[in-house]
């Protein structure tokens, strides 16, 4: 048989042309140090800041420190199986988390993995945890109210959709309760809620999740949890993961409420990571960029322009103070970033005034423009009245004789404090808030004994529900008060029927 050299050479040539090498070229390095959620690696010459890196055992890390000799890496998850000398590879990607509708009703960790035992989350959408905030021209001013269902907040420090309102106070003053009640009040309000629990006990998070489930709020809520037992990198990442999930909905034109509970623990986790990465410590041993840590997070909350869908992210960050010191480093940082703060006082809480909102130290810088007309009318002088009452109350401790006008102010003040109290997990619709505050500010409660105010309010709301639902409907639909004569007549009718005269 004759050998055809041309045929063979053509065949070989074809084989060479069709050959596809079955390998990929990736830059690798070697782990030189491991411990406390931190690794150092040598050899990753072209790695990017924030890039995702893959360890030999399948764990992932994120490049944080880019130095001339090595790279400082925070490890996402368990680091006990990683050893010095292990290989580490670049992925060329930055960290992303799963996003979308399928996360609603689920409890996930900061990497988007389910921790509620309800199976896998099926979504093919992801978003980067670090993303630029909307620019100046991409934003709209805050104009729509976000009703918390709490009289003290909706009347004194109103919050608008797209606002950042800090909730600040000592531990055990009711910060989480305010957030949970606000989430409960978003039912049927076309609002998606994200609750980010940072550095809390797992039993506490479980309790919050059960509360949300019990009241049907888990149907529109995502819970992101990085518990106290988890490594610092996950506590540091949790808020960014939460806001990435929120951005997906915002850019679809939806409205989102996100709660960060709390950013003090995130700052402590970041301080721990920074010290382990040998970054220079500053005030209170925090690194120099701790302000940027929170500003780049909170600036991502906004009400975006109509061209981008007109959606919004409203942020309620928490800061825990020590002995009521709101001039501490992290507290003043976050106060300067946010659009106002709600200060919860230890003394008020212990005196049974709950929610323990200190009206004098609390402010909402942009929420007033989002408050509905009816609430503006009834609550306009409430803050000043409350402040003057506190002043007079302190003055009366000296036992001075009081004139009739001062005594009347004190009586009104005591009733105001009682009306603004509210039981937990019982948010009140805004139309009911308006009616009781109208009755208060127009003197209808001046003859009601202070001890009977709570019972008075319960019966008052029941009466309006049964006898005058049209008044509540008018306030709900028009966002304004009905004719004063109509309201006065209805309240007088209630007083004539009741035993409070």
Swiss-Prot record:
Q: Where in the chain is the site Required for activity?
A: 362
- Keyword Ion transport set for record: yes
Identify the domain of life.
Answer: Bacteria
Tell me, which GO biological process terms does this entry list?
Answer: proton motive force-driven ATP synthesis
Q: What is its EC number?
A: 7.1.2.2
Detail the disulphide connectivity of this chain as listed in its UniProt entry. Answer: none
Entry annotated with the keyword Ribonucleoprotein = no
HAMAP family given in the database record: ATP_synth_alpha_bact (MF_01346)
For this entry, the protein name equals: ATP synthase subunit alpha
């Amino acid at each position: 048989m004759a050998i055809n050299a041309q045929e063979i050479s053509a065949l070989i040539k074809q084989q060479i042309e069709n050959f596809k090498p079955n390998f990929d070229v990736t830059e690798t390095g070697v782990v030189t140090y491991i411990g406390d959620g931190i690794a150092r690696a040598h050899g990753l010459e072209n790695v990017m800041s924030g890039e995702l890196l893959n360890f030999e055992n399948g764990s992932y890390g994120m490049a944080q420190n880019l130095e001339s000799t090595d790279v400082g890496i925070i490890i996402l998850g368990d680091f006990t199986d990683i050893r010095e000398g292990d290989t580490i590879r670049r992925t060329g990607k930055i960290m992303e988390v799963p996003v979308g509708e399928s996360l609603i009703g689920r409890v996930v960790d900061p990497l988007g993995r389910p921790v509620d035992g309800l199976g896998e989350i099926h979504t093919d959408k992801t978003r980067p945890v670090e993303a630029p905030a909307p620019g100046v021209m991409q934003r709209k001013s805050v104009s729509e109210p976000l009703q918390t269902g709490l009289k003290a907040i909706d009347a004194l420090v109103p919050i608008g959709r797209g606002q950042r309102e800090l909730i600040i106070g000592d531990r055990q003053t009711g910060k989480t309760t305010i957030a949970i009640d606000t989430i409960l009040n978003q039912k049927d309000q076309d609002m998606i809620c994200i609750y980010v629990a940072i550095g809390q006990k797992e039993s506490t998070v479980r309790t919050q999740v059960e509360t949300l489930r019990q009241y049907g709020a888990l149907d529109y809520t995502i819970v992101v949890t990085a518990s106290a037992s988890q490594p610092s990198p996950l506590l540091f990442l949790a808020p960014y993961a939460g806001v990435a999930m929120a951005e997906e909905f915002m850019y679809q034109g939806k409205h989102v409420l996100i709660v960060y509970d709390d950013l003090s623990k995130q700052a402590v986790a970041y301080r721990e990571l920074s010290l382990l990465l040998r970054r220079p410590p500053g005030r209170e041993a925090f690194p120099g960029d701790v302000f940027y840590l929170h500003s780049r997070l909170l600036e991502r909350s906004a009400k975006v322009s109509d061209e981008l869908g007109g959606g919004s992210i409203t942020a309620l960050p928490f800061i825990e103070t020590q002995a009521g010191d709101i001039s501490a480093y992290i507290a003043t940082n976050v106060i300067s970033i946010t659009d106002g703060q709600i200060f919860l006082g230890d003394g008020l809480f212990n005196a049974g005034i709950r929610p323990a909102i200190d009206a004098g130290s609390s402010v909402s810088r942009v929420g007033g423009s989002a408050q509905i007309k009816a609430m503006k009318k009834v609550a306009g002088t409430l803050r000043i009245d409350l402040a003057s009452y506190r002043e007079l109350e302190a003055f009366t401790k000296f036992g001075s004789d009081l004139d009739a006008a001062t005594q009347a102010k004190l009586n009104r003040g005591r009733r105001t404090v009682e009306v603004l109290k509210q039981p937990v997990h019982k948010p009140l619709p805004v139309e009911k808030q308006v009616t009781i505050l109208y009755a208060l500010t127009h003197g209808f409660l001046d003859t009601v004994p202070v001890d009977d105010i709570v019972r008075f309010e319960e019966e008052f709301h029941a009466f309006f529900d049964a006898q005058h639902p049209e008044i509540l409907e008018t306030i709900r639909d028009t966002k304004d008060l009905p004719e004063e004569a109509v309201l006065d007549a209805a309240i007088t009718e209630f007083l004539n029927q009741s035993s409070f005269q």
